[in-house]
Amino acid sequence: VNFQPWFFVVIKGEKGCNHIRQCYDREWFRSAPIYILVCADHRSSWIRKSDGKDHADIDVAIATEHICLAATEKELGTCWVCNFDTDLCKQLFNLPNGVEPVVIVPIGYPKEPEVFVSTPKRRKAFNEIVKWENF
């Protein structure tokens, strides 16, 4: 099944950039020269018959990560932004009913590596996330 239930709004003009920055107002976010608003089109998504699960979010996540990987290959920086005002986003970008804004991907050239301050991240141990044969 290849329903492709996604929609991409590429934002690079002044008006669009101002709109997207209203939806997620962070200093680092404002410096991006281009954004992609990735939306799930629930009107055309695949629904699993056994339990009614709408797979639009899963398909959108796969497409978004491919965008991020392609940008990285071109030495561009990206970030998944999911904690934004989705209602305002729907309004400002005139999204139709059934089309949900899922993630904003700002894209730009990253700062030089020495500018970043690295903070250690706790990662779950392998045996916390992988089980063999059974949960």
Which residue ranges define each predicted feature?
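N-terminal amphipathic, basic helical "cap/leader" segment at the start of enzyme domains
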Residues: 1-34, 135
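Short, charged/polar surface micro-motifs in flexible loops or helix N-caps
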Residues: 11-18, 41-45, 86-87, 111
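Helix-adjacent hinge/juxtasegments
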Residues: 25-60
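Structural motif
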Residues: 33-35, 78, 100-104
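Small-aliphatic-rich amphipathic alpha-helix that forms the alpha element of a beta-alpha
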Residues: 36, 51-92
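Short, electropositive alpha-helical surface patch
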Residues: 89-102
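C-terminal helix-cap and adjacent tail motif
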Residues: 103-135
